[in-house]
Amino acid sequence: MATRFNLPPLFLALLLLLLSAAAAGTAPPTCSRIECPSYDVVDQGNGFEIRRYISPLWISTSSIDDISLVNATRQGFLLLFDYIQGKNEYGETIEMTAPVITQVSPSDGPFCASSFVVSFYVPKQNQGKPPPADGLSVQKWGVSYAAVRQFAGFVSDYGVAEEAAALYSSLEGSAWFDAVEKQDPTSVYTVAQYNSPFEFTDRVNEIWLILSVEGNSL
């Protein structure tokens, strides 16, 4: 005969709250201060979570060739910062958002330049008609799935490669590994940075692997 447990209502309410928080995932603290793209967490595993992004819009640089992700991101960010400060065809200033992402297509060798595209998330109020600007273009993602790994501190070229490898390894044997294998080969991984260079504590960065999910049916 099964034993029945009578749990206090307060305990049940707390349990439900904890479960709902786990399902929602841990959003970077920056997103409580400035706008970030919205997403749902559809799965979590050891060292990763799977997010579904709801059609985010980005303003992006052209491809930047460099041997350093850090240098390329700095170069791209300066262009994007000028853009949001009004250096666009409308002379329009735009609110800062997070994250700034760098899509990485690694080179074939350690001394060859990789290709980087740096992007700024366009706030919802500007998505209807984002201002054009020379050298920048709009990327509109459909509903997109990403495997995500968070890490702290300042981004470094060597550290990013290690974090990307760790995310890839954590997905092996999971139901999502095949979707990683089918991803867009022109963007092997994406680095998302949420903090200003002048913030020295509580820094949050992420590695994203964009997944090829047929029909976005999940």
Which sequence ranges carry the predicted segments?
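A solvent-exposed interaction/effector surface
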Residues: 2-218
